[in-house]
Amino acid sequence: MTEFLHSPLHAEHEKLGATFTPFGPWEMPLKYANELDEHRAVRNAAGLFDLSHMGEIWVNGPDAAEFLSYCFISNLVPLKEGKAKYSMICAEDGGIMDDLITYRLEETKFLVVPNAGNACLLYTSPSPRD
């Protein structure tokens, strides 16, 4: 039997009757009772999504925006403090390795949030280009 990683909210999801599914190395809640009821609740009130499993890559320094723009398909230089941008990182052959969100927290401080299974891969992937 595979041992999955669990978010800090796993016990709460269990108490609420979640049905779980594998997501990379994580076991994540897929649904609770009825999908239509969940949909209506989100449309009429609010919905929460547990992001505990997502990766976090911190990039700091005077050239952080230029470095991230080099690594991703988006130009992050004009991104204003307190804003975020959805982007992607591509493999050498042009295929998409992952989609991610980058937050500019300060002028020289960024938080990159990749999908859970790709955080380690992305952390080690940027390499010099010819």
For the regions a language model picked out, list residue spans one by one.
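Acidic, proline/glycine-enriched N-terminal capping motif
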Residues: 1-90, 95-97
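Helix N-cap motif at beta-to-alpha junctions
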Residues: 62, 115-119
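Phosphate- and divalent-cation-binding pockets in alpha/beta enzyme and binding domains
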Residues: 67, 121-122
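Glycine-rich, Trp-frequent "lid" loop and neighboring beta-strands that shape
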Residues: 101-102
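Conserved small/polar residues in nucleotide/adenosyl-binding loops
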Residues: 123-130
